[in-house]
């Protein structure tokens, strides 16, 4: 089987530019490993794959559009793959092969590791090899000047990564002729062009604060490999806002590539673009070569198991259209137009979706049409519902498989069906009428609390043994009775719910803690009110420490550990990407009353005799 491998391909990819890349190399998979990620973020899983050509091995990242190959157990250790599209990026001073397209060669089966592949040479070895080549013959064009191999040591300087496998479209001459996939973009490249469809365009937003005033807009861009957000400020608003039209395809070049602020956008990409003075944008002649939209649908039944404030995609049949209503914000006294519509799907559930502003006023879709929503927020007011954000998109009767299947189901049996609603989920123990019985951790797990259709409530005596230090808070709206996440608009913070901008957010806790007792350990979710009691600081104060005094922040986290409390908890089923699990949330805590605990133990001993 070794003769089928593209021997030496990884070395060529590591040291050459795209013009010298071997076409569609065949490699063997040595390992497939899921990267650690925050399961509550909603981001897709990422996988690291080590590939071998029998002489060398290289670390690679799998494009999220290929995740299904891992889930279906097709991409596994020992399998053989043929790369059809890839690029090379520099990440943390290492070259990483980004796999954007591949075919699993199932006919070759699965085998033990072929040969004894080694990591590619270190920087010094590569330089020595290149010097020998230069002495033997004229220098070959396209040799990478990067000082890092796929597994190289840290170097003093980092050069841009070589470009990926490319296509040459009939693009304007002033633009680069190399078409990069969106997922291949990184800050380490400066000559690229993407061909992407505008799936969402915001309105022009204005801000005024102590540092001045300005305006901005943003667009979501989509191609076959993924999505990315692009933002323009001030002069770039005047230059590009009217050019970019929602739904159209463009060639875009010469933007700045920045690390994405993921807490402020629902676009799943490590990077984001910023339009600059030299940015070039031209409309593509072929408007059909790029997909219209990319969805990751959650069924309406599963919406009840999704965390509040999560941003998801849904699809349903429009069953009811409510009238336009005007509401007044208590915080700003400003009026807002809204409209509630109802959609249903084949899981037997209905869901209220709230439209806002211009979308609500101009909505004229006929009932029984198919509506696909991308990036709507999950609410928990008067039962589970959904709400469109300024970044959300709505497609009517989209030409996708899910739409056709849903239409067929509704015409065949769904039209006369009765649909269920998700009931109101109370956020406090006092309003549930349930007894919070004292349990130890082993009893909570053995009794499978939270696995029934309704939440279970219990009391737990335990000690905090660990606090996750990542994502302990989020920027919230400072208006009374709002608490929604706000988004950085480049000098101000915008609340979608209040439709207002603020100079600064008010941070609120979202902490994950590990609590232990004599029978085991349990992970609990903690929100703002309880977080203040545990940390003895507000989330604003802790965020300031995290940004300005790392040692003080770490000391504060350490001091909050190994403290005993009585935790009042809720256990509820949570469906995350098709996997059922139980989420435990702390509703309130109490300091230990040792006198009362002693009496409790005495009563327990006496009852056991």
UniProtKB/Swiss-Prot annotation:
<dbReference type="GO" id="GO:0140445">
    <property type="term" value="C:chromosome, telomeric repeat region"/>
</dbReference>
<dbReference type="InterPro" id="IPR012340">
    <property type="entry name" value="NA-bd_OB-fold"/>
</dbReference>
<dbReference type="GO" id="GO:0005634">
    <property type="term" value="C:nucleus"/>
</dbReference>
<dbReference type="GO" id="GO:0005662">
    <property type="term" value="C:DNA replication factor A complex"/>
</dbReference>
<dbReference type="GO" id="GO:0042162">
    <property type="term" value="F:telomeric DNA binding"/>
</dbReference>
<keyword id="KW-0862">Zinc</keyword>
<dbReference type="Pfam" id="PF16900">
    <property type="entry name" value="REPA_OB_2"/>
</dbReference>
<dbReference type="GO" id="GO:0033260">
    <property type="term" value="P:nuclear DNA replication"/>
</dbReference>
<dbReference type="GO" id="GO:0006281">
    <property type="term" value="P:DNA repair"/>
</dbReference>
<dbReference type="GO" id="GO:0043047">
    <property type="term" value="F:single-stranded telomeric DNA binding"/>
</dbReference>
<keyword id="KW-0863">Zinc-finger</keyword>
<dbReference type="Pfam" id="PF01336">
    <property type="entry name" value="tRNA_anti-codon"/>
</dbReference>
<protein>
    <recommendedName>
        <fullName>Replication factor A protein 1</fullName>
    </recommendedName>
</protein>
<dbReference type="GO" id="GO:0000724">
    <property type="term" value="P:double-strand break repair via homologous recombination"/>
</dbReference>
<feature type="zinc finger region" description="C4-type">
    <location>
        <begin position="477"/>
        <end position="498"/>
    </location>
</feature>
<dbReference type="GO" id="GO:0005737">
    <property type="term" value="C:cytoplasm"/>
</dbReference>
<comment type="subunit">
    <text>Component of the heterotrimeric canonical replication protein A complex (RPA).</text>
</comment>
<dbReference type="GO" id="GO:0005829">
    <property type="term" value="C:cytosol"/>
</dbReference>
<keyword id="KW-0539">Nucleus</keyword>
<keyword id="KW-0238">DNA-binding</keyword>
<dbReference type="GO" id="GO:0035861">
    <property type="term" value="C:site of double-strand break"/>
</dbReference>
<dbReference type="Pfam" id="PF04057">
    <property type="entry name" value="Rep-A_N"/>
</dbReference>
<dbReference type="GO" id="GO:0000785">
    <property type="term" value="C:chromatin"/>
</dbReference>
<feature type="compositionally biased region" description="Polar residues">
    <location>
        <begin position="130"/>
        <end position="152"/>
    </location>
</feature>
<dbReference type="GO" id="GO:0008270">
    <property type="term" value="F:zinc ion binding"/>
</dbReference>
<dbReference type="InterPro" id="IPR004591">
    <property type="entry name" value="Rfa1"/>
</dbReference>
<dbReference type="InterPro" id="IPR031657">
    <property type="entry name" value="REPA_OB_2"/>
</dbReference>
<comment type="similarity">
    <text>Belongs to the replication factor A protein 1 family.</text>
</comment>
<dbReference type="GO" id="GO:0051321">
    <property type="term" value="P:meiotic cell cycle"/>
</dbReference>
<dbReference type="GO" id="GO:0090734">
    <property type="term" value="C:site of DNA damage"/>
</dbReference>
<comment type="function">
    <text>As part of the replication protein A (RPA/RP-A), a single-stranded DNA-binding heterotrimeric complex, may play an essential role in DNA replication, recombination and repair. Binds and stabilizes single-stranded DNA intermediates, preventing complementary DNA reannealing and recruiting different proteins involved in DNA metabolism.</text>
</comment>
<dbReference type="GO" id="GO:0000723">
    <property type="term" value="P:telomere maintenance"/>
</dbReference>
<keyword id="KW-0235">DNA replication</keyword>
<dbReference type="InterPro" id="IPR007199">
    <property type="entry name" value="Rep_factor-A_N"/>
</dbReference>
<feature type="region of interest" description="Disordered">
    <location>
        <begin position="130"/>
        <end position="166"/>
    </location>
</feature>
<dbReference type="GO" id="GO:0070034">
    <property type="term" value="F:telomerase RNA binding"/>
</dbReference>
<dbReference type="GO" id="GO:0006260">
    <property type="term" value="P:DNA replication"/>
</dbReference>
<dbReference type="GO" id="GO:0003697">
    <property type="term" value="F:single-stranded DNA binding"/>
</dbReference>
<dbReference type="GO" id="GO:0003684">
    <property type="term" value="F:damaged DNA binding"/>
</dbReference>
<dbReference type="InterPro" id="IPR004365">
    <property type="entry name" value="NA-bd_OB_tRNA"/>
</dbReference>
<dbReference type="InterPro" id="IPR047192">
    <property type="entry name" value="Euk_RPA1_DBD_C"/>
</dbReference>
<feature type="DNA-binding region" description="OB">
    <location>
        <begin position="192"/>
        <end position="278"/>
    </location>
</feature>
